[in-house]
Every structure is written in structure tokens, then in C-alpha cells.
Amino acid sequence: MARNQQLRPFKRPAIRLYPAVNETELIRTLPEVVEFNAQANPDHVFCLQAKKSPNKSILSLVSVTNRQLKQAISQCVGWLKSNLKLQLPSLLHGSVEKGAPVALLMESDIGLFIYEIALIGLGVPVLLLSARLSAPAINSLLQRTSAAAIIVSGRLEATAREAAETLPAAVFSPLPFEAFLSTNEGLPDNDSICHPYHYIDESDRNVLILHSSGTTGLPKPIYVSHRHLLSFVNCHRLDLESEAQGVNVSTLPLYHGFGLVAPALAMGVGKTVCFPPGSTVPSAGATLDLLRISNAASFMTVPSILEDIAFLGDEGIQALAGLDYVTFGGGILKPSVGEELAVHGVKLLNHYGTTESGPLAPIFVPQDDYNWRFFRLRDDLRLQLDEIAPNGNERRFKLTTFPFGLEQPFEIQDQLVCNPDYPGSDFNAVGRNDDTIVLATGEKVQPQILESILCESSLVKSAIAFGEHQFEIGVLVQLAADVPPKNYSKLREQLWPLVARANESMDGHARIQSSEAVLLLPSTVTIPRTDKGSIARKDVYKMFEADIAGVYRKLESAGPVLCLDMETLEEDLKLLISRCTDWPPDWAVTDDLFERGMNSLQAIRVQRALVAAVTRSLRGVCQPERIGRDFVYIHPSVRAMADFFREPVNGLQLPNGFSTRGWAPDQLVQRFALTSKDGRATVLLTGATGSLGSHCLLSLIQSPNIKRVICLVRPEDSFTDPRLRLQKSLESKKLHLSSTQWSMVDVLGCHTASQYLGLTREQYTILQESVTYILHAAWPMDFHWKLPSFQSQFQSLHNLLALARDIHNRRPSIKPRLTFISSIATVGQYARVHGVRMVPETSVDSVECLNPIGYAEAKLVCERMLEHARLHYPHEMTVSYVRMGQIAGSSTTGFWNINEHIPALTLSWIPVDVAAQSITELLLSPAPAELIYHIENPIRQSWHDMLQTIAAVLHLSASDALPWNEWQEQVAAAGDTDNPAKKLQDFFANDFIRMGCGEVVLGTDKARKASATLRRVDAVSEGCVRGYLQYWKEIGWLK
């Protein structure tokens, strides 16, 4: 513990990670820990929040006690209830149901923590977003979690609004944390911040939603439970009060899992946490100031900041050597830096964990026998270590965890080696099983987006990103053909548009900013690969180690090289910074660069460019060595930098007659936005005049997630208005739209098999700029057509797929989803071929599974077209198809199209309005889309009961019922007039018994997982059947 700090009694909350069944009085959630500490340790300081003074050169500390923390959270709860339409948990049919999540995209300070605990206490799931995510990444997480709202700090608002452009999530600006702290005087302490249903049970993982990088390059949501969060509170071996108390400075962002360890220690053992200002990126110098003014006893950070502090020399090392421990994690500390710090008495503590499992290494005060190169595994969690194949003579292990609330174990992708002195407890991660690149900042990069886009080019044979433990990534590109090295510069120019396209979908820290980071390799070089044919990434890095090192040497001296003229110094500096960051010029020379959103990678690029500029234009009056890695952090505005260069102490001589000129703001760059400002989606719908399509239209416009539906309607003739045709079609089906609903519908007359879907170029452009979903429900219903007759249907689907690509190319942040309506007919013979009745939601593996009719063959062709699109264009569109079982009439209006086959011919009817609602839910599902879904009523019904209902309504007696074969004979013998069954005679003879009486059963597991309506579907009721018969009587079809 640091000197001059007094021990204060702290009563620790009783938390057991594996409580006995009968232990019901224990603390279960973080909000309950907050309430316990407010009662048991009210005056103990929970945190010190650093704030910038007005001149931004001096830090002040705001002290927050446990009582104040609880009262601030209570105030935040009130604000949330008043300003957001929160869906609080409620008891429904004996079980608790939660509402949609609320996302937090905020700067990392105590305010973020207050909002997080307030929402958790209300029972509202919290999506915690990194402030470093790109708009496409945020958009993906908002979609996948169905977040209802997003609370956004000011400087992040532009990114958030871009991300939420096509989504229903509302954007809110938070109150600063000071507002909650300044209004809590005199508030009662007995007001609970815990909603009665905020805790459901131990299996509930819809509590806090963190995120990591998924295999597609976009982040994936990670759902964690209350018990998972409590494991942070117990992540220590600080049994002595002298070790447990004192101030713990943490530069770790609170929107990452590692960042939660420090405040959890404050909650669990009373170790006061000190947060840096939320609007700044921590630097070495600022961190040393914070350690000093807070009188810190310990420090938690990432390797890159430790390395920067070590570069400061004795000043930095001595400040660290006086601490009880210095914890680092999220990346690997360079051995040379670690050794230097350890030699000078710094007590380094290696930390380890994953987003899915939480912290796996306890916080403790290292003793002399501890080796900082290894982390020590916790002994209070259920962990499983297994030895795997060695790497040469080095033993390797894999670690399996059992996350709280997760039913299955989680195997960590890192390979571990053990400390020979403590082989059962101390380990180090030496490589990942997956392809994640971990930067020097601890940030992670999934390189698949970059690599796959580059490999699309005919110039490229293979692409492998690199950058492990560096500040930015680069990419090795193996050329597809032999090219003389003298032409490499021209090739880089040709490839750069692809890199720029990839950058648009990658986070800021994961982007390539210079063509110098593209390392070209000849086509003849042998790239190391595994037995499976995949690239052996680590072997590639080793093989080209010298070349990669050369790339980073070039990057150190690369960047925009500008002259700094003392007459125009501010303007020159601003231009340099803008080129390094790609910022538009709508900012002032007095703006704090980090409050504006500069990240650590951009700060390094600016520093490099400044070194080059000083070397080129100011050598002799200012030494480049003065522009250290900390320079941008120390001088975080153009004005501050200019003042530094003008100071005589820095060796600059101002020209005679020089006078500082006032700065005139540049003109704002015009920014173009997508047309939808409220975040709702636009759907392109075909087949809206058909039975299923019309009910899909009604379902879509009733969804709060939909802004507009554009219907492509084939005109009956050159005179009929397409909108009028649609209106008459809906009315014939007893579907009536209000004026408000009609205002959401656009109707375009078209021929979808023609170029641009038969639209004008202007109309097609509108689709490119607005559509986010495509639902293709149009299809001719004729069982006599042969396969060649469906050519126009294949061309229509081709054109819609082309539109999806055009949408993505025009709006790279949008990945449109196209859903095609297929049929049970494509698997009508599945039971005969495979010997099982249940048809899985998989592709057709044999044409023998088809019903032998052109209708089924054509649907299969379209299914195969979609499978091809999913394989070859995974980053441009999402495609799926839905095989429909037998659709009945509407459950509300009784409408059942007399021209569609089999009213009353199948044993598992699903009403058309229910089917349409299920399709809408599959189309708009935030979960990753499956390729294939089935929609069918899983409830099988008795023909005997159904026929009794029909007979009663039609006043038929039992003697009127005929055996199946005899009925077929009468159908065949009767004339064609007034005999609608005659045209389906072949179907009755060949397919009805198999498809209509239970021999073909569509599996619906995937569809029911994504559709709440399909999960709730019931048998068709007697009232429903009476409605169908009544409708047919009304239109004169039944007499």
C-alpha cells in the first residue's frame, strides 16, 4: 500500500460463486452489492474520477463514496424512466419476460458505470459498446441484439446516428455524471435501485451484453449473467487490509471486460479505483500525473502504456516501482520492457481472461517467487486444463472454462505454456488457435474482411494480414501472376481501392492507412499452409519476419510530409493532422484532439508526421527527438502544438516582423446521409397482389421496425394504375389499409425479368439508396408448367440479387437481406429417398427429392441460385429461402384463395396471416440469418374431426362421405365445368397422400428459433374452418 494512506474498516460483501441450493440470503447481483456497500460502507470512497480543469493542463479529482454511488444510480434510474420508453421485466404466464436491451456508447468514466448499474438494477439488458467501434460494427450489434435505444456521448453521436440509420433504435444523449452527484444530497438511503424482477435465475445471461470480434470480422454479442459479473468482485487474493485498500489507478476502458475488474475490486474489498478523464486517451505523462495526485497504491493498464512509461526513463520507472503491483493485460508486454521494469523493482502482475469467461487470473501483491511472464490461474473457478500436442520440446495446454449461466463449456482459443517452477498454476499464452491479431494497444483485429476483399481481385493469389503486438496492421499480398518488382508501386495503386473498401467495414484501430503497409510477394513464393490447406499464419509471419519489420520501419518515416511554415503554422499543423486522421476540416485549432475522437493509433500517426515535418523544414531550430511518442498527448490541440514550436526554449527563432494571425474557420464539408433518419427499414416486396404476399405487406407495415414498403407490381395492362391494382387486390382479400398505412406503401409498376427490374434508371437508383430488405414472394401458381416456362422467374431472381449487390456497392455500410419464398414441393419425395419423414432445414442433396413437376424443379433452381450467392457474395448480401408448407386461409377474415390448390387438402394447415407474420419475423430477425427455413404448422390434425366440422357447416350427412379412391374416380369422371378439383387430378393421384397426410413433415427448428409467432402457432380451430367455408359461400364458390 502506498505511503501516507490510512486503513479504514471495510466490511466485505458475502459472495459465493457456487452457493448451496439452500443459501438464499446471499448477494446475487452487482446492484445488490452497491446497496450492501451503501449500508455497510457508506463513507468509504468507491472511486476518484479525474477531470480536466478549464485550461486542460491540471487534473482535479471528484470523490464518490459508496453512499453517493448508490444515490447517483438512483437518480439515474429516475432519469432513465422519465426519458426512455423502457421495457421493464414483467411476470407473464408465471415467468419473467425482459424487454429489449439499451445500448451504451459512452466515454469511459464513472458516468458509464452509473448508467450500466442503473439499467442492470432495472432488469433492462445492457449492450456495452466500445467507443472505438466503427458504424458498421455498431449497426451489426444493434441488429443482432434488437436494442431498443442507444445512449451516446456527444463526441460519439455522429457514429451512433450513422450506425442506427436503418434501425429502430432511438438515440439519446446522457446527462453527465455530475448531474446525478449534485442532486443526491439529503436523499433517503432506503430507496432500492433493484427492480423486483431484475434477477430471474442463474441461467439468465441476458443481463450485460459485451462484445468481441466474430469470425466474419464484425463483433459478436457476448451475453453474460449476474453470477458472471459477481466473479469480477471475487477476482483477487487480497486477504490483508494493507493489500486490499489504497487507490488503484486504472486506464482500462469500462466498456471492455478487463476494465470491469478495477471497479469490481472497489466493490469487493474497498480498493478505491481512480479513473482518468473520459474524454482523453491515456498517455504516459498523463498517467504519471494521475498516479501522483491520487497517491496511488497500484496500477492497472495495457502493455502499450507501460512501454511508453518505460521510455520516459527514471521518472516513469521510479513512479511504478513504488506501487504494490502494476497489473497489465489485454496484450503481451515486450520482454525487453518487462525485464527493465522488473530489474528496477516494479512489481509486474500478468492478468488474463476472455470476454466469454471473465477474469481468469486473480489480483494479488506479487512476491519474490512470482515470474511476471506468467499469469496465475484462479482457484475459485471451475477450470479444466488439458495437455495438447507439444511444440517441439515445449509442452502446450488448452484451457476450458465453464461460464456462469452457459450450459456448455467454453474452450479458449489460446495455447498455453506453463511455468516450470509452478506448472499447475502459472501459465502464459503463446498463440491463438484462431486468426485474431492482438495489437500493442490490446485491441483485437479480425482480418477476414480485409483478406477476403483483397482475394476477390484477379491480381491477388492470397492475402495475409499481420500486425501482432504492433500499433497498426499491414497485409502480405501474394500476386496471382509474375510481375517485375519495378511495377509494384503501380500494383499497389490498383489494389488500394480494395483496401479502402475494406477499411469502411473495419474499426478505426484495424484500418490500413498507408500503401506502404501493403507488402507484395511474387506469385512463385511458397506460402506455408496447414494439412487442411488453410494458411499457417504464424509460419507466414516467421518466414517474412524481416520484410514485415521493414514495413514498420518505413511506416515510422511515412505519412504526409509537409513543411511547417512559421507564417502559417496553425494552418499547416491542422492540414497535417487532417491528413493523418481523414477528418473533414470542420474543427478549430483550439479543439482538444482527443475530445474530438482521436484514438491512440491516430496519435502515433500524427507524431510520426510531425517528426518528418520537423526533420524536413525545421531541422536546426528544433530537434526531431523533441517530438516524442507522448507529444500529441502533452499538446492535444493545434494551438498547443504551435505554442510549443514558438517557445524560445525549444530553439525556434521567429522571423522578423512575424505576428500570430487569427485563424479563420474553413468551410464545412457537405455530408450526405441516407434517406432514413429514424432508423427504420425499407422493404422491397414482390408478389404483393398474391395471397401470401398481400398478407406479408400487411404484416410488414404493422411492424414498428418498418419505415416503408416498396411493392413491385406487374401491371395487368397499360391502362391500370399499379397502385389501384394493389388496392383492389387487397380489398378482394378483405384486407383494408388505413390512410396512415397507405402512406407507408410505394407501388411501382414493373417487369422484374427486364433490365433494372423494368424500372426507370431513376426509380432503380431510389431502390439502391433506400432498400435494406428484399422479400421475393412473387411466383406463378401453375402445376402444368414445365421447367423451361420459368425462365423469367430465374431472370427475376437474378435481377433482385444484382440489386442487392448494387445496394451494398452504393452504401457499403448496408448489407441487404434477401429472402425468397420456396416450397415444400422441392422436398416432396424426401421421405422416399432418405427413408425418414422429417425433412431438415438443409439444402436439397438430390433431385430425386423433388416432386416431378416443373413448379418444384423451378423452385429448386432458385434455391441453388441463392446458395451460390451466399457462397460467393457473403460480404455484400445476406440471402435465405423459406420452404412453405401448406398455407390455409386467413385466421381473421376467412379469406382463402379458390385458385390456390388444396383448400382442405392438407393435414397441417397454417393460416396465411400467421405464415406472413412468421416470414416478417424471419426477414427482420436481428440474429444471423440461416440459409434455409421451413414454415409449416407443426400441429398435425385429425382428418376425421376436420371432416365432421366441414360436414356440419355444409349440412352433409355421414353417408355423403366417400372413401378416397372412390372420390378420385368421381372427380375424374365428372366434367370440367364447376369442377375445380379436376385440374389437380394428377396431384391427387400422385402426391396428395404423401404430402397432405403426414408422409412429408417439414422440420422447423431454425425457423421457430427466429420466429415467436411460429413458436406459438396452434392447430386450426373449428371457428377458423367455419370462416373459410363462409367466405367461399359469400363469393359463390360453395352453394
Curated annotation (Swiss-Prot):
The modification O-(pantetheine 4'-phosphoryl)serine is found at residue 600. Nonribosomal peptide synthase-like protein; part of the gene cluster that mediates the biosynthesis of cichorine, a phytotoxin active against knapweed, corn, and soybeans. The first step in the pathway is performed by the non-reducing polyketide synthase pkbA that condenses one acetyl-CoA starter unit with 3 malonyl-CoA units. PkbA also catalyzes one methylation step to produce 3-methylorsellinate. The nonribosomal peptide synthase-like protein cicB, the cytochrome P450 monooxygenase cicH and the O-methyltransferase cicE are involved in the conversion of 3-methylorsellinate into nidulol. This is Adenylate-forming reductase cicB. One of its GO terms (biological process) is cichorine biosynthetic process. Pathway: Phytotoxin biosynthesis. PANTHER family: ENZYME, PUTATIVE (JCVI)-RELATED, PHENYLACETATE-COENZYME A LIGASE. It comes from Emericella nidulans (strain FGSC A4 / ATCC 38163 / CBS 112.46 / NRRL 194 / M139) (Aspergillus nidulans). Its EC number is 1.2.1.-. AMP binds at residues 256, 350-351, 355, 429-432.
